Amino acid sequence: MTDRVALRAGVPPFYVMDVWLAAAERQRTHGDLVNLSAGQPSAGAPEPVRAAAAAALHLNQLGYSVALGIPELRDAIAADYQRRHGITVEPDAVVITTGSSGGFLLAFLACFDAGDRVAMASPGYPCYRNILSALGCEVVEIPCGPQTRFQPTAQMLAEIDPPLRGVVVASPANPTGTVIPPEELAAIASWCDASDVRLISDEVYHGLVYQGAPQTSCAWQTSRNAVVVNSFSKYYAMTGWRLGWLLVPTVLRRAVDCLTGNFTICPPVLSQIAAVSAFTPEATAEADGNLASYAINRSLLLDGLRRIGIDRLAPTDGAFYVYADVSDFTSDSLAFCSKLLADTGVAIAPGIDFDTARGGSFVRISFAGPSGDIEEALRRIGSWLPSQ
């Protein structure tokens, strides 16, 4: 039997998942893990969602749904855009996906061919780069720094040559948490329309924005040619339910329907039924309560990092991460994070995951967990850093 592995499978790992594996082993062997490596909310799904799931299990009516998702959920999502953003979204434009990860795969397959040039910010979410590379696209990474809040601008896109076929933006962004101001997102969307470039707008962290940050906006407020990606994982704390959605332009809907029907048949039906209840006032109040907890954690982490000598931090407008410059201590963030875990039991994510050129000098620290974990992590890191 041949030992050949397809070339497209040779993408880099998502290093955060490797960190999680090492963290689990640390907990198994030492029992002292403090895990600040991933965007895993400590809160569970809202109570109305869990109650709806229990009722659906009791009825035992969990066969396939149509590929694009159950009508009740598509209706609820469409109505939520009117409430939150004041825009009218037809339920037919909403496509339910197997997490936002499944949504990105569908969007990239529907929008781009092998060889197409697709731009993204660096630092940025590594799975954009890795999925696009596996599909044969040419990924154009745009170095972004403090001058633009680690975000691309329409002017930066206009200066790229040869021309692009697509652009991926995220607001709030992972790993930095920065928000693209509404006027800049509108400028990016307008430039994409004028340049025949497909915009993919990652809005997974909408709802998680802190006081004083720019307001978040939806790409569809400017352009219905964009593909919007969102998820139940972050604001609604439903990571393991594997449910997300797309807003899809009319011209792409049949293609997305065919792709999802062939790939997954349908998203998880139990999750779909339960998620309808995420849009109740009770569930929204619970999710907003989580945001208040994250805000406390954010202050704890930002203040604590500065006290221990890590003070060059990306503006943490939203999401639940701090992207920190640790160049005073290392130029190899992967080795730095591995040693931190081995020496102290604290797990954080290496910046090399998010920026292949400059990420050796950065780390990402999540504050989605309990406040006590953040306080303990700061104590351990503060004791450990002077020896590095």
Swiss-Prot record:
The modification N6-(pyridoxal phosphate)lysine is found at residue 234. GO terms for molecular function: pyridoxal phosphate binding; valine-pyruvate transaminase activity. Coiled coil: none annotated. Keywords: Aminotransferase, Pyridoxal phosphate, Transferase. Its EC number is 2.6.1.66. Its cofactor is pyridoxal 5'-phosphate. It catalyses: L-valine + pyruvate = 3-methyl-2-oxobutanoate + L-alanine. GO terms for cellular component: peptidoglycan-based cell wall. It is an enzyme of class 2 (transferase). Pfam families: Aminotran_1_2. The keyword Transferase applies. GO terms for biological process: amino acid metabolic process; biosynthetic process. InterPro entries: Aminotransferase_I/II_large (IPR004839), AspAT/PAT-like (IPR050596), NHTrfase_class1_PyrdxlP-BS (IPR004838), PyrdxlP-dep_Trfase (IPR015424), PyrdxlP-dep_Trfase_major (IPR015421). Belongs to the class-I pyridoxal-phosphate-dependent aminotransferase family. This is Valine--pyruvate aminotransferase. It comes from Mycobacterium tuberculosis (strain ATCC 25618 / H37Rv). The lineage of its organism: Bacteria, Bacillati, Actinomycetota, Actinomycetes, Mycobacteriales.
